[in-house]
Amino acid sequence: MYKDIDSHQRDSRTDGHQDGFKKNPNFRFFKKKTCKFCDMDRVPDYKEFDFLKKFITEQGKILPRRITGTSAKHQRRLALEIKKARYMALLPFVKK
């Protein structure tokens, strides 16, 4: 009823996805970033605008979590505090 397939045929893939990271020379393992706020036991505050500048791009955009490494909870709080600092003119909306 069932064909007898040896284990080598069953495990190999024809589309080239098996062990793709070993074959791709550009593949790199990235060190997982840790949240700076969790490590230092602090919360983002709009009054610390020098520290908040680290989380803003040159154009004035808020950096995403995948780049900064902040946790979801602290990223939401960080965005609110940056917006408060912008509203109070401690941080610019747009950098030139």
From Swiss-Prot:
Subunit architecture: Part of the 30S ribosomal subunit. Forms a tight heterodimer with protein bS6.
Any Gene Ontology CC annotation: cytosolic small ribosomal subunit
Residue ranges of the region described as Disordered: 1-25
Listed Basic and acidic residues bias regions: 1-22
Name of this chain's protein: Small ribosomal subunit protein bS18
Keyword set includes rRNA-binding: yes
Keywords annotated in UniProt: Ribonucleoprotein, Ribosomal protein, RNA-binding, rRNA-binding
Known function: Binds as a heterodimer with protein bS6 to the central domain of the 16S rRNA, where it helps stabilize the platform of the 30S subunit.
UniProt-listed GO biological process terms: translation
